[in-house]
Structure formats: structure tokens, C-alpha cells
Amino acid sequence: AATRPPMHDSLPLLERTPFPAIRRATLDTLQVNLGYRCNQSCLHCHVNASPQRTEMMDDATLALIPRVLAARRPRTLDLTGGAPELHSGFRGLVRAARAQGVRVINRCNLTILLEPGQEDLAPFLADQGVDVVASMPCYSAANVDRQRGDGVFDKSIEGLRRLNALGYGQDGSGLTLNLVYNPQGPSLPPDQQRLQADYKRELAAHFGIVFNELYALTNMPIQRFGSTLVS
């Protein structure tokens, strides 16, 4: 795992703001955090997830989600964590949502596809037609391993290859593979379209990997990343 500095609380600084509350109009996407357990411990993580965290959504709460989908009819269920795939109810929830015709997004860190017991995860996602939004903070091994831990880049590349082999990111497959970039340090992301072109060129040239789109995100100034900003 990546080496972590001492934690500092950034929440009190964020609470001192006149920024108005944001209210939705209609419910289009239901995002659900299934828990804080993760097989990685990234320096930028805004929920402080790690293999040591034990907090996971309880079964009673999980059972409510298909009922909410049926009652409110959002178009998309967006599953995140931690590593959402580590929740014992993950696959059952995916099946229940897809049975209702709800689009499912799995926010995947890629290395989870190589974990013991998860060997059939990628085929499961493909069989269910789940959209994969995969964390890939750089196309450089040094930058990825600095943020996410030694060896994470190589495992991420292997995860992408497995998804590509199943049709993810391939034209006409109907299986969507989008990547997510986030800054390495206290800075804003570069232009998304230019960065996407760089990713497509470098990943194809060096690893034969294809994907659909790249999202350039700004890190949330809370938990580990917030701590680095005030350190």
C-alpha cells in the first residue's frame, strides 16, 4: 500500500463556506456506497478506504435498494466504495437492478479483478452488461504506484486486458469501459479531451488497451487528500 502521512481533519475548513445547498430536480442516478473495505489504500481516497476498514452496508439496508429502484425508477444505479465488489451482496444487487432494466455502473479499481475469489468477476460484469468506470490515475507506472501502491499499475493493466478480452471498450460490443483520471497532488486536472487523447494513444501503443471515454476528476478535499492539503 502507498505510504500514508499523518491525518489532519479538513472538514472544519469546508464547513466555513457561504456556498449554497445544491438540490436535485428529478432522480436520475442513485449512487450507493457499499462500504469502506478496499484492497487498496490510496493517498487521495476521500473515504479513507483500506483493507483494514470493516464498515460495510448491512443486509437490511442493502435489501431496501431494489425497492427504492422500483418505487423511484432512476435510470442508473452507481455502485461505489471502497471496493464495492467486496460486499457479499454486490452480485445479488447487480442482478436485481438489471432485472428491473436499470443501468448499473461499477466503480472499479481494476486490481480487484485479480484478487483471490474474484476470478469470475469480470465475466460476471460482462454477462450482466454492467458499465465499468475504472480508476486509472495515469498511463505511467511510476505515477500510479506512487499514488496507489507498488505493483498497482501492472495489476491495473492486467485488469484492463481482461476487460478488453471480454469486449469491454470494443466498438459494437455494448460493453462500456470508461477510465477515471485524478490529479497526483494539490492541483486541478488538465483538459479532459486532450488527456483522453493522450491515454488512448499511450495505452494502445504500449499495451494494446482500448476504452471508451476518460473522465478527469478533481479530488475531494476531505479525508486523506484533504489532510495532505492542510499538512
Specify the residue positions occupied by each region the protein language model found.
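Conserved alpha-helical substructure of the radical SAM core
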Residues: 4-81, 85-102
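Surface-exposed beta-strand edges and their flanking turn/coil or helix-capping segments
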Residues: 45-47, 58-60, 92, 119, ...
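Amphipathic repeat-derived elements
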Residues: 61-70, 93-98, 102-104, 117-119, ...
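Alpha-helical scaffolding segments of alpha/beta enzyme cores, especially the outer helices
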Residues: 64-67, 89-99, 120-123, 155-158, ...
